[in-house]
From Swiss-Prot:
This is Methionine--tRNA ligase. It is an enzyme of class 6 (ligase). Pfam families: tRNA-synt_1g (PF09334), tRNA_bind (PF01588). A motif ('KMSKS' region) lies at residues 341-345. It comes from Bordetella parapertussis (strain 12822 / ATCC BAA-587 / NCTC 13253). GO terms for biological process: methionyl-tRNA aminoacylation. One of its GO terms (cellular component) is cytosol. Is required not only for elongation of protein synthesis but also for the initiation of all mRNA translation through initiator tRNA(fMet) aminoacylation. The gene is metG. Its main location: cytoplasm.
């Protein structure tokens, strides 16, 4: 029976180009979609750019463009990747669209009416210079456990400790270097801990769709059981902060000025927005298609790093907003190279665009990924030697080789006409059975099993062909009797029928090649469907070259670091070149003295300056203005020693006279990490000592 499916992949964040992980996920989903369509099912396969959030806003600001312009730039390059790897979405959209605004706000209002939205006052770090609340990734400081410097606000990359941002020692804003302050703000929470949500998720995470397929893979189900409380019955779900404060690039929360939906609320809603846009363009009824009681199956392909959002928040949001919940969540692992995490610095990064630009066949990669992917949450390893061996041995040596040998005999001696001696019904039934097994493997996402079975069939076809030795019969074909000619024609016809069946089985993986085989070799006027495997061909056109072998040297080019990266000049120290050389006499003219900071206070009317009162051992105090307000709180500097340019001519400023200059280190770009550092001598130095 024909089914209707709504299929999505995770939305790529629109502040960068596609990486190889995106391409792997899209290929995995594309293979599944193509196989389902070949079975006669209706599939709506949509994607979109995840176009909101602080990272996009800040990157656009840094480049001096609007967030919309940044998103549009990356959206414009998507087709080059998708078309290049034969990934065929029905529609590509964006979360920064009227459809997504309307749907996100509708879902929010529905959840609010269900009593599942709660307002709470929370304290967060706030950057007083940037004028915005800081997410954990924008806060850095000293790890409270191992004391490693410059660690993020939620975890330490050195010791692995997890902590709250408020536990960091000497925290600073990664955006400006300023010391953040704690500030209260009202936020909106989705009450995932509500007993209704917990009960629903306990049922949904262990449930199955209409086809009897579990919503979640076993590994994912086990993980959600941990989050839901496991077998002890104790609910462990926390509520979800779904709001962010202005300035923020996103969707405004209804009736809450200055508040925006957190990007992870409106991003998955983008699946629905893309489908709604597609339905409008195609004249389809969006609401009927996603009727919770309707037959449409909702299927998501995602990576293992975003399970929490998709297996808990997303289905609960949809359920209590009165919408259709997902039927299947297909989770995959990451890509490694030769068993290790990809690394540009080690020359093991794979750029999808570079892959295409150096002339590598997209279907080599599609085949290799299919040969490695399965339905479990496992990482897929790309091994260069294995890649070359599989493509050259399987696709060229086994699969294409059948057609190149058999078609030559048929076109040369039988004018392209195929004829079979014996029971063709049995042969057709054999191909039908094989194709059904492969189709089922693809539907179950056991792609590696499907590929193994296909190549086993190819081996048997080649073995039968070699055992019959048609080249021996062909040598004397001019003088051969009718039986010998019929035998030669039958051997080659059966091989080509097998090749056609293999092409049908490989069509989800190698769509471009299979289409060529169908149209150019066998004269079809449409791409293959699963039922074509059992339709024995009657004619074959002269063989044309179908696939090139992989040149191992291409792999060297693929992993070669980009020329710009290899030849880039060494980074300038501190972001600027060293100053011109001076003599010791020039340096001696500068009188550097140790000074104690007796007092420090903010300067009213200035966003950059602090007023320092310094003891330089002169029997009087000096007044010095310093542009270090973004990095220090006044009280933190009192009592500290520092270094003063003592013989600098006094400078009359708007706020008073500055009698010298305190030395501080910073990057040439004052907004760059890690900010400004006032020089502080070792303990034991005394005010008035000269620095020589």
């Amino acid at each position: 029976m024909s089914r209707t499916l709504f299929v999505t992949t995770a939305l790529p964040y629109a502040n960068g180009s596609f990486h190889i992980g995106h391409i792997m996920e899209y290929i995995q989903a594309d293979i599944w979609v193509r196989s389902m369509r070949m079975a006669g099912h209706t599939v709506h396969f949509v994607g979109a750019d995840d176009a909101h959030g602080a990272p996009i806003m800040l990157k656009a600001e840094k480049e001096g463009i609007t967030p919309q312009a940044l998103v549009a730039r990356y959206a414009a390059e998507r087709p080059r990747y998708l078309d290049g790897f034969h990934i065929r979405f029905d529609h590509w959209h964006s979360t920064d669209t009227p459809e997504n605004v309307a749907l996100s706000q509708e879902i929010y209002r529905a959840l609010k009416s269900e009593g599942l939205i709660e307002t709470r006052s929370i304290e967060q770090f706030y950057d007083p210079v940037k004028g915005m609340f800081l997410a954990d990734r924008y806060i850095k400081g000293e790890c409270p456990r191992c004391h490693a410097k410059d660690q993020y606000g939620d975890s330490c990359e050195v010791c692995g400790a997890v902590y709250a941002p408020t536990e960091l020692i000497n925290p600073y804003s990664a955006l400006t270097g300023a010391a953040p302050v704690l500030k209260s703000s009202d936020h909106f929470f989705f009450k995932l801990s509500d007993p209704r949500c917990v009960e629903f998720l306990q049922q949904w995470t262990t449930g199955a769709n209409r086809q009897g397929v579990k919503h979640l893979q076993a590994e994912v189900q086990a993980k959600t059981r941990e989050w839901l409380g496991g077998d002890d019955g104790e609910a462990k779900l926390g509520d979800w902060d779904i709001s962010r404060d202005a300035p923020y690039f996103g969707i405004e929360i209804p009736d809450a000025p200055g508040k925006y939906f957190y990007v992870w609320l409106d991003a998955p809603v983008g699946y629905l927005a893309s489908l709604k846009s597609y339905c409008a363009a195609k004249g389809l009824d969006f609401d009927a298609l996603l009727d919770p009681a309707g037959p449409t199956e909702q299927v998501h392909f995602i990576g293992k790093d975003i399970i929490y959002f998709h297996a808990l928040f997303w289905p609960a949001m949809l359920k209590f907003a009165g919408r259709k919940t997902p039927d299947q969540l297909n989770v995959h692992g990451f890509i490694t190279v030769s068993g290790e995490k990809m690394s540009k610095s080690r020359g093991t990064g794979i750029s999808p665009l570079r892959y295409l630009e150096i002339g590598m066949d997209a279907e080599w990669l599609r085949y290799y990924m299919a040969a490695k992917l399965n339905a479990r949450v496992e990482d897929m390893d790309f091994n260069p030697e294995d890649f070359v061996a599989r493509v050259n041995s399987d696709l060229v040596g086994k699969y294409v080789n059948i057609a190149s040998r058999a078609a030559a005999f048929i076109t040369r001696h039988f004018d392209g006409e195929l004829a079979y001696d014996g029971d063709t019904d049995a042969l057709a039934a054999e191909f039908a059975q094989q194709a059904e097994s492969i189709r089922a493997a693809f539907e179950a996402r056991e792609y590696n099993r499907a590929v193994r079975e296909i190549m086993a069939h190819a081996d048997r076809i080649n073995q039968a062909f070699d055992a019959a030795q048609p080249w021996v019969m062909a040598k004397g074909i001019g003088a051969a009797d009718a039986a010998t000619r019929a035998r030669l024609q039958d051997i080659c016809s059966r091989a080509l029928a097998g090749f056609k069946a293999l092409s049908v089985m490989l069509a989800p993986v190698l769509p471009a090649l299979a289409s060529r085989v169908a149209r150019e070799l066998f004269g079809a006027n449409a791409d293959f469907a699963w039922g074509d495997a059992q339709q024995l061909p009657q004619r074959v056109a002269p063989f044309k070259h179908l696939m090139q072998r992989v040149d191992p040297k291409l792999l060297d080019d693929l992993f070669e670091p980009p020329a710009a990266e290899a030849s880039a000049p060494a980074a300038l120290p501190g972001g600027e070149a060293l100053a011109d050389t001076i003599t010791i006499d020039d340096f001696a003219k500068i009188d550097l003295r140790i000074a104690r900071i007796v007092n420090c206070e903010e300067v009213e009317g200035s966003t950059k300056l602090l007023r320092l009162t310094l003891d330089v051992g002169e029997g009087r105090h000096r007044n010095v203005f310093s542009g270090i307000k973004s990095a220090y709180q006044p009280q933190d500097l009192v009592g500290k020693l520092t270094v003063l340019v003592a013989n600098l001519a006094p400078r009359k400023m708007k706020f008073g006279v500055s009698e010298g200059m305190v030395l501080a280190a910073s990057h040439a770009d004052e907004k760059a990490e890690p900010g400004i550092y006032v020089l502080e001598p070792w303990p034991g130095a005394q005010p008035g000592m000269r620095v020589r």
